Design a protein with these regions (language model features):
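Outer-membrane beta-barrel proteins and related beta-barrel translocases across Gram-negative bacteria
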Residues: 1-217
Length: 217
């Protein structure tokens, strides 16, 4: 394992302390990285309506943890959790370590089985979108959960059968939407109806059986 500590003094914001810790043992490996800046000085703008000044006096931070491991040669798992204090964090401070994705922070729990016939995957997955301000229409969907089962059978005469299937519950956090489908903007008080395809919370099932024949050369 190894660790890195990174202190930074950022003009118009303050003192930030960041770090990364990586480890490897057996068939498991992972890392955690993050930074913390207490009591942000608010940037160089004195306009309280300027996005640069939106977080004056607030603690700014992010954390990103990932882990991958195996129970057996066929059964593996992965976990990831990323979060930030606000959607503008990377615009203001960037990202210090190896991961360069600054548009989303992923949350994931996954268990996968790779067999000779069946491949199975179960996961819960979501994202924090790093935009500020974040439009309600741009809020990402969570998969809670997503279950996949795929299989293939091959015969000596060239015939084969396949089964591909997935069932996923999609969930989207639309703040301010009431039970009648109306969304109210807290700042302006304006209301509008949320279309079903826009909310789109619900279960999706995909089943794809197939049969075929492949000629041997």
């Amino acid at each position: 394992y190894d660790a890195t500590i990174t202190p930074r003094v950022i003009s118009d914001h303050g003192f930030m302390l960041g770090g990364e810790f990586r480890y490897l043992f057996g068939s498991d490996q992972g890392s955690i990285e993050g930074s913390y800046l207490p009591n942000d000085n608010g940037g160089e703008s004195d306009n309280p309506n300027d996005p640069d000044d939106a977080f004056d006096g607030e603690d700014r931070w992010y954390v990103d943890y990932s882990h991958y491991g195996r129970f057996t040669e066929r059964l593996d798992y992965a976990m990831r959790y990323g979060a930030a204090s606000d959607g503008r964090y990377f615009d203001d401070f960037g990202r210090d370590f190896g991961e360069q994705d600054t548009e989303y922070l992923e949350r994931l729990a996954r268990l996968s089985y790779q067999g000779t016939t069946w491949n199975l995957d179960a996961r819960a997955q979501g994202y924090q979108r790093m935009d500020y301000p974040l439009d309600e229409d741009d809020r990402p969907y969570y998969q809670l959960p997503s279950l996949t089962a795929n299989a293939r059978w091959q015969q000596d005469n060239g015939f084969y059968q396949e089964w591909n299937s997935n069932a996923t519950y999609f969930w989207r956090d639309l703040q301010g939407v009431d039970s009648d489908g109306f969304w109210e903007d807290e700042e302006t008080g304006n209301t509008r109806r949320i279309l079903l395809r826009e909310a789109a919370n619900g279960t999706r099932v995909n089943l794809t059986p197939a049969i075929g024949w492949r000629a041997q050369p």
